[in-house]
Amino acid sequence: MNTPAYAEIGITTNFSFLRGGSDPRAYVHQASILGISAIGIADHNTLAGVVRAYKELDNDKVLHKPKLLIGARIVFIDGTPDILVYPRDRAAYGRLCQLLTRGKRGDDVTRIEKGECRLTFSDLLAFSEGQLLVLTLPHRFEPAQALDVLAKLKATRAEGVWLAASLVHRGDDRRRLARLDDLATTAKVQLLATNEVLYHDPARRPLQDVLTCIREKTTIEAVGRKLEANAERFLKTPREMSRLFRDFPDAIAETMRFANKIDFSLDQLRYQYPDEPVPPGKTAQGHLEDLTWAGVDKYFAGKIDDKLRATLKKELALIAELKYAHYFLTVHDIVHYARSQNILCQGRGSAANSAVCYVLGITSVDPTKVDLLFERFISKERLEPPDIDVDFEHSRREEVMQYVYRRYGRHRAAIIATIIHYRPRSAIRDVGKALGLTEDVTAALADTVWGSWGSGLNDMQVKQAGLDPQNPMINLAVELATELIEFPRHLSQHVGGYVLTQDRLDTYVPIGNAAMDDRTFIEWDKDDVDALNMMKVDVLALGMLTCIRKCFDLIDQHKGERWVLASVPQDDPKVYDMLCDGESLGVFQVESRAQMNMLPRLKPRTFYDLVIEVAIVRPGPIQGDMVHPYLRRRNGQEKVNYPSPSPEHGPADELYKVLHKTKGVPLFQEQAMRIAIEAAKFTSEEANGLRRSMATFRNVGTIGKYEDKLIGNMVARGYDPNFARSCFDQIKGFGSYGFPESHAASFAQLVYISSWLKYHHPDAFCCGLLNSQPMGFYAPAQIVGDARKNGVEVRDIDVSYSFAQNTLEQGSGKYCAVRLGFRQIDGFHWLDEDEEHLKRSLLSFRGAPLGANPESIGPHMPGGMDSGLDAGASPRNDKKEDWANRIVAARNRRPFTSLEDFARDTGLPKRALILLADADAFRSLGLDRREALWQVRRLPDDVPLPLFEAATAREQPDEHAKPLPLMPRPEQVVADYQTIRLSLKGHPMEFLREMLSRERVVACKDVNHQNERRRVRCAGVVLVRQRPGSASGVVFMTLEDETGIANVVVWPKIMEQYRKEVMGARLILVEGYIQSSPEKVTHLIAQRMVDRSHDLIGLANDSLTRKHPVPSGDALIEPLNDDRRDHADAPAQKIRHPRNVRILPPSRDFH
C-alpha cells in the first residue's frame, strides 16, 4: 500500500521567539529528506521567518522541493483559540499583512508597544476574505465555544474553514480525535491533520524546553506543566503521520487538498518603487538628467573633459534602461532636505563609484581624481537594485528619518528590521538561568567570552571560570547554549535602511511600532529585502559628521572662519606630517592602535594614500598577506612587478590596469573581483556570485565553493600558485569585512578633514569630539589629555562659566581654551541643541497640512504630498529637565554670589546641586568640592522661590566655625573620575607610581624607549581592548598611565592563559619583552599578566573612607553613582564596599 502524500501545515519556527526550536531553513531541509509534499510556516503573529524558508528552496542541497505555504498563527487577546491563517492568493496575503499590522501598530487611539501584537477575533473577521482558516483547540476545550467560532468563520468571505486535529500523546488521543471529528461533522467543516510542529528533529526537545523556561522566566525545576508533555512535536514522515491517523485517513488526505488550494507564493510580490514628483511636462528620467547637468555646472563650472562627459552619459543611459530614475531622485531629495537644514551628509559605499551621484551632491568622491567602477554599483547583468548609503550627522539623523516618514506616509515607508540573535554571552546567561545555575556561575562563564561573536565555550574557558567542564550540569549548559547561539531573540530596527513603496507597504509585509514613538519598522531584515529585490534607501548615522559640523560651528563662532566640507584646503603637508608621526587620536577611521601603527609605516602624503590607509588595515588585505608586500614595494624594499599568466594564455600586462595603483598588490574588493574575471576567467554570473558571497561576514560559509575554480583556473593559466592562494584568502577576508575602493575613498575624505581640524584647530576638535560622544575609540579623559599635549588649555566645569555643551573661551596662548560643559557630569540633566532641532522639525511637520505642496516642509519639486501621518505620531515627549540651561538663564540675569544665591536663582533640585558640588563646579564662588558638598547638605530640600523667601526664611545655624580640611589631591582626582570621567588635576596612576617603582615597573612612556627584546614590566589603566577577526586570536591592548600610553600584544596562547585578566582588569601589570619596528613603533609582547585593579580600588577606598572632623550624625557624602540618576529625591547613599566603587570609566573594547 502506497503512503499517502502529506502536508504539514502547523509549523512553528524559532521566529516565534522563544517558542520554536528550529530555524525555517532546517524545516525545508528536513521536509525534503522526509518526503513531505508541503510545509506551512505559521509563526505566532508574525511573517518574520518566511523569506528564509523561501530562499532555502533555491539551495542546491534541497533535492526534493516541498511546496511552501506562507501563513501565520493568530494568537488573540480575547480568549479565542489560536487560528492558522493561510492566504490563498496575493490579495489575501496583503490582507494578512494588514491584519498583523493592525495588531502591531494599533489605531489612532491606541498605540501598541514594540514587540506586542494585540488582535481580537473581530479583527480577523474583518480581514478574512481569501484566507484559509484552521481552528486549533487546546487539549481541553469547550465544544460550544468551538462551534460558535467555526460558525462565525464560515459566515465570512474566507476561502475555507478547517478544524485542526493533533495528537497530544497523553493516553486519550483516540477519544480526543473522535470528539474533534464529531465537532467537525457538526460544524460541517473538514478535519485537518497536523503535528503542530515545534522543532524539526526530536533531538531539539531539550532546547525547546529551555526556550519555554526563558520565555516564562522560570527554571526547569519550577516550570511544571508549561513544558510540552513529550518529545513528539517534531516533523514526522508521511508514513508515520498516516499511521497515527489511521482511523481518520481523510484528515491526512485533506492536508493535500488544503495545500493545493493555495496559489500564493512570495514570487508574486511585484515590488514597485514610488514615483517622485517632477516638474510639469517632465519625466523622472528627464528631471534626473536636468539635475545631473546642473550639478556639472555647480561642481565643475560646466567645464568637464570628454571622459567624464561620456561617463555621465553612460550612467544616465543605464539608469534609464533599468528605470531607476525615481530612486536617484529620492536620494537626491533626502540629501537636499538635510542640507537645507544645515545637516552634514555624505554618500558612501558602492554609490561612490557613480559620477552621477557625485554631481547630484550625494557622494563626495571626485570622478576626475579616482577611477570609478560604475558596474559595481549598477549592472545590467546582475539585475539587482542599486543601494545608496548616505551618512548623516548622528545627532541630527532623526530629523531626516522623520522627514522620510512624512514625505511618503507610514503606510508606504518603514525601516527594515535587524534580527537580534543569541550570542555566546546572552546564550550562556539565559540557558544558565533556565537550568537553575546561580548568577555567579553564569556570570563567570559569560565573562570568559570575548565580544559578541563566537561559536560557543570550550573546556579551557570553563576551567578559567573556575568550573569543572565534566560536571553534568555545566556540560549541559554549555551544550544547550552552543545550540542556542544564532537563534533569533527578537526584532529590532536596522541602523537606517528604509523600504519605500508606490502602493501600501503593509500589503507586502507587516509593520510594527518601534520603541521610539515616531518610528515604525517592517518584520523583514536586509537579507530578506534583498532576496525579494525590494529597493531600500539607507539613512545612516555617522558620529564624525556630527563632530565636524560642531567643529565648524565653534570655529565660526569663536574665530570668525567659515568652513564647509568642500572648502577645507587639500594636500596640506603639515597635516600629512602629523599623520606620518602616528598622531591620529580622534581622527576618523585611523585612530585605532593598528591604524596608528600603520601610519608611520605607510607614510601617507596624498589623498590616495589615505584611501589605501583606510582599506589596508582590514581582514581582506591582512588575510591575503598583501599588507607587507605592498609596504615593502612602497618603501622601495621590493621591486614592483605584476603577476602574469603563461604567454600562451594571455599578455604579460593582463593585470597591470587592475593593480598598477597599488604597486601590483591587490588591496580592494574591486581588484579581487577584476582578478577573478581577468585572471581566473570567471563569467559575469560567476563573478556576481563571488561578489555576493563576500558581501558580508554572514556569508563566509558560502564562499568555499569558488575556491577550487578560482585557484585552479589561475594556476592552469600559468599564475603562481602562491599568488592564486593569496588572492582567494584575500577574498575570504573581504567576506569578513573589507572596503571597496569607492567606500575607502568616501571615508578618506573625512579622514583628511578630521586630520586638518586636529592639526589646525585642536581646540575646536577636542571640543567637537567631546560634544559628539559617545563615538570613537577613546574616552573623554584621553581626548582631553591629547588636546593638552598639543597646547590646548582645558578648564574645569564651573557654574559661572560653563554651558550645557563644552565650549571655547579666550585662551592665553595660540589656541582658544576649552571650557568643560555640564554634559560631562554623569547624571546631570541637559538638553542638546540637536534635540531642539528635532522637536522644531517635528512640530513644523505636524503643522504642514496633509496634501500640501512639498515645498512647505522641504525642498521638493511641486507635487502632491502623501497623507500618511498618523494622528498618534507626535513629537517625542522628553520629560527630562534641562538643568544646564536653567543655570545659564539665571546667570544671564545676574552673577551668582553664593551657593544659596545660586540655588535660589536657578531653582534646581537638591540632587542637581549635589552633582554640581561633586563635580567641583563651585570654585568661582570660593568653594572647593568638600565645602560645596557641606553647604548643599545644609540647604533645605526645597529651595523657596524669591517671592516667598522672606515668608519662609529661617536662620541657618553655623555648624562649624573653622574651615573643613582641604581634600587631598588623590581624593580630588578620584572624585573627578567618578563624576566627570576625567580629571585636570592629575592621573590616578601617579599616586601609585612610588609603589610601582619599588616593584621595578616602568612608566608607559619609558616602554617606547627600551631596546629590542628587553624584558620589562609595565602597568597601566586599560583604555582599549581589540581582538580583530583578522588577527587570528591576537589581542591588542592600550594601557595608559600619567606619562602616556603603551601598546601591548597578547598572543593567543597567553590570552587563553590569562583570559580573566585580559578581559576583566581595569589596571593591569604586564611583563614581557619589547618589539620595535624600523618606524619606531613599539609593542610590549605580553608573557605574564596580573590584575592590579585592587590598587585602584584601594586608592578610592582611602579617598572615600578617610576620616575628617564632621559633626556627629552626618555622613560624608560620596559622589553619586549611576544607579541614582532616575531618583531625583534619593537620599545620599552610604559608602559602598570598595569592590563596587567605580573609579574609572570602563575600557572601550572592539572585536
UniProtKB/Swiss-Prot annotation:
Signal peptide: none annotated. CDD domains: DnaE_OBF (cd04485), PHP_PolIIIA_DnaE2 (cd07434). Pfam families: DNA_pol3_alpha (PF07733), DNA_pol3_finger (PF17657), HHH_6 (PF14579), PHP (PF02811), tRNA_anti-codon (PF01336). GO terms for molecular function: 3'-5' exonuclease activity; DNA-directed DNA polymerase activity; nucleic acid binding. GO terms for cellular component: cytoplasm. GO terms for biological process: DNA repair; DNA replication. Coiled coil: none annotated. Its EC number is 2.7.7.7. It comes from the Bacteria. Residues 1108-1151 are annotated as: Disordered. Keywords: Cytoplasm, DNA damage, DNA repair, DNA replication, DNA-directed DNA polymerase, Nucleotidyltransferase, Transferase. It is found in: Cytoplasm. It catalyses: DNA(n) + a 2'-deoxyribonucleoside 5'-triphosphate = DNA(n+1) + diphosphate. Belongs to the DNA polymerase type-C family. DnaE2 subfamily. PANTHER family: DNA POLYMERASE III SUBUNIT ALPHA (PTHR32294), ERROR-PRONE DNA POLYMERASE (PTHR32294:SF4). HAMAP family: DNApol_error_prone. DNA polymerase involved in damage-induced mutagenesis and translesion synthesis (TLS). It is not the major replicative DNA polymerase. This is Error-prone DNA polymerase. The gene is dnaE2.
